């Protein structure tokens, strides 16, 4: 045996003397368990919990963290401060037995008080740091999550209690939380296996308040998951939703006493934007379409403020009375409930439409989707909200439709019988004052000018309808030579030409070589159609005079194929009006008489309507009234009688 082997054996024998034995390991574990039991005894937890060593260590760590974070805050509310207040100063340190008895009594009172407070709370309390480390969880958490306080504290972080999809939303809320304000957020929390069979997550409304770097939150289920016994107040209504009775607690939420509400209609308290939604739910209940209904509405308080309220309404079997459980909610909860109710409406409509025929399913899906989208159209209240939106939606159409029906485009004179007017054909023995047709600044010409080689579509011409009154076209001014408007086979004078859309443009944009062509020569009812050349800006004379060549007959393009004007009836050469001196004098006299009569009526109209902006170029004519007209008629009758007498 070598020396090396003997040395190794000596080392091994020496190490066996210092190696831990089975008894030493057990003694060490017992010592650790004893320390853990001592720590567990200091925890404010009932011995009935029978915590494991691992649970005890995790809760101990949480308790130490809470004591460190709330140092100086908890000293004012500890049991020892209560003991010091209860025990007299002279015996507080002398009689240790008395101090212990008072301590036990205070602990018992605190436990009873804490139990009463937890029972009165609408949820459970969670305290955690801004980075999510848990500091405190109330014992009534098992009523909402199915998990005990000890199980919740094993996670060590508040974010471990949340659903993964809501973690970032809660983090952003905590980052934006002001030190002195409150934040509301709806998030989903993980539940026990038994509750998970009913729903994967439990949506809770978390009301967070930040104080001294500690977030204290009150977590309670959303209003749609609360039982009826936990409603803020109950109301009973008749079939027309008049209040028959109300809980006394309505005074704390709306400011009205129960006696003030009895006999009033429920709709008087609702926001105008929520009336339709509430009426639809009300009608569905009365029609026995559903056993109960959920409503998300805004209610006006006595101080004229608006609050969100979730109402669960149900009718009796006879449908003669309706009971409502009302829950006051925050705006954050209202947004969540609005989304949930909208999604449930969409899902129910899609399931009902799936059983219908394929042709009807597409129509019902679109209509149901639209109804689900507009079911909860309740934006945040503004003072400008009124019932005008409901008024328009009841059958009067949208606001744009009312505006379109009230204001046409383009505007037309008030006496126009139709937006599109037709040319007027004068008899051969009458003439129209040309000065009424072509004023220097406001003449009416076709808005759509066509190229010279384009044929006119018959649909572009105005249908034969109400003729335009010539007096509406322009004010009296700038008379033209009446001989320039006379045609060889009779005076054919157009009143106005309208484009297809009825738009009228000033005469300054009319090309100087545009002329009027008769549609069918020789026909007494032939209408005039415009034949326009390329648009050229021309300057109209200030006196309104139009050169003779501008009113000449312009030949139509050959081969145009117009159905309105046969080729054989179209002029082929430039022809001017040719009348002898006697004819021109007679026509001029007749035109002057007509012009004088028109000016008299214009003056009478201007006296009645002071808003007229046109003034006459001629000297003011005497105003014609009914007396003057009667005297003229009597004079004509007397002249006619004298003529017969002479005969």
Curated annotation (Swiss-Prot):
Q: Does the keyword Metal-binding apply?
A: no
Q: Which InterPro entries match?
A: bHLH_dom, bHLH_NPAS4, HLH_DNA-bd_sf, PAS, PAS-like_dom_sf
What cystine pairs are annotated? none
Q: Which UniProt keywords apply?
A: Activator, Differentiation, DNA-binding, Nucleus, Repeat, Transcription, Transcription regulation
Q: Where in the cell is it found?
A: Nucleus
Q: Which Pfam families match?
A: bHLH_NPAS4 (PF23183), PAS_11 (PF14598)
This chain's protein is named: Neuronal PAS domain-containing protein 4-like
Q: Which organism is it from?
A: Danio rerio (Zebrafish)
């Amino acid at each position: 045996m070598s020396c090396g082997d003997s040395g190794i054996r000596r080392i091994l024998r020496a190490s066996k003397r210092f190696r831990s034995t089975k008894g030493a390991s057990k003694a060490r574990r017992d010592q650790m368990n004893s320390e853990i039991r001592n720590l567990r005894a200091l925890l404010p937890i009932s011995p009935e919990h029978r915590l494991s060593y691992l649970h005890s260590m995790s809760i101990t760590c949480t308790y130490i963290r809470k004591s460190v974070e709330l140092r100086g805050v908890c000293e004012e509310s500890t049991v020892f401060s209560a003991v010091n207040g209860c025990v007299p100063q002279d015996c507080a340190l002398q009689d240790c037995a008395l101090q212990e008895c008072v301590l036990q009594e205070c602990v018992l009172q605190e436990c009873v008080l804490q139990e009463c407070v937890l029972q009165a709370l609408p949820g459970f309390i969670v305290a955690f740091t801004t980075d999510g480390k848990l500091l405190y969880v109330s014992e009534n958490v098992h009523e909402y999550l199915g998990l005990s306080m000890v199980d919740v504290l094993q996670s060590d972080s508040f974010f471990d209690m949340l659903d993964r999809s809501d973690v970032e939303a809660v983090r952003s809320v905590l980052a934006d939380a002001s030190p002195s304000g409150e934040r509301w957020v709806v998030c989903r929390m993980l539940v026990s296996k038994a509750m998970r069979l009913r729903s994967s997550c439990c949506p809770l409304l978390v009301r967070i308040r930040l104080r001294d770097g500690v977030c204290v939150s009150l977590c309670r289920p959303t209003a749609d998951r609360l039982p009826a016994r936990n409603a803020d107040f109950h109301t009973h209504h008749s079939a027309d939703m008049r209040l028959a009775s109300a809980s006394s607690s309505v005074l704390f939420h709306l400011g009205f006493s129960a006696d003030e509400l009895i006999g009033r209609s429920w709709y008087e308290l609702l926001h105008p934007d929520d009336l339709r939604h509430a009426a639809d739910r009300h009608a569905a209940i009365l029609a026995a379409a559903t056993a109960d209904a959920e409503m998300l509405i805004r209610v006006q308080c006595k101080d004229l403020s608006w609050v969100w309220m979730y109402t669960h309404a149900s009718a009796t079997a006879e449908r003669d009375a309706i009971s409502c459980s009302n829950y006051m909610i925050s705006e954050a909860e209202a947004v969540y409930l609005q989304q949930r109710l909208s999604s449930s409406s969409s899902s129910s409509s899609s399931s009902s439409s799936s059983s219908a025929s394929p042709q009807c399913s597409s129509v019902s899906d679109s209509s149901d989707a639209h109804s689900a989208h507009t079911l909860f159209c309740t934006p945040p209240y503004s003072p400008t909200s009124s019932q005008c939106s409901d008024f328009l939606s009841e059958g009067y159409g949208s606001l744009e439709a009312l505006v379109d029906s009230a204001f046409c485009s383009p505007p037309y004179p008030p006496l126009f019988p139709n937006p599109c007017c037709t040319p007027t054909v004068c008899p051969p023995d009458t003439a129209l004052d040309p000065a009424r047709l072509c004023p220097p600044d406001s003449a009416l010409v076709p808005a759509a000018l066509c190229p010279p080689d384009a044929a006119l579509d018959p649909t572009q011409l105005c249908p034969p309808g109400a003729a335009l009154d010539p007096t509406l076209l322009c004010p009296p001014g700038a008379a033209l030579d009446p001989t320039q408007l006379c045609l060889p086979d009779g005076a054919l004078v157009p009143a106005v030409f309208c484009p297809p859309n009825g738009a009228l443009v000033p005469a300054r944009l009319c090309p100087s070589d545009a002329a009027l062509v008769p549609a069918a020569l020789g026909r007494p009812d032939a209408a005039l159609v415009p034949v326009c050349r390329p648009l050229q800006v021309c300057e109209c004379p200030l006196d309104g005079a139009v050169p003779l060549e501008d009113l000449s007959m312009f030949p139509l393009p050959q081969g145009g194929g117009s159905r309105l004007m046969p080729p054989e009836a179209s002029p082929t050469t430039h022809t001017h009006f040719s009348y002898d001196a006697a004819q021109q004098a007679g026509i001029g006299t007749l035109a002057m008489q007509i012009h004088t009569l028109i000016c008299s009526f214009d003056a009478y109209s201007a006296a009645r309507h002071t808003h007229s902006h046109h003034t006459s170029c001629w000297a003011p004519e005497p105003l014609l009234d009914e007396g003057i007209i009667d005297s003229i008629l009597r004079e004509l009758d007397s002249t006619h009688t004298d003529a017969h007498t002479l005969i």
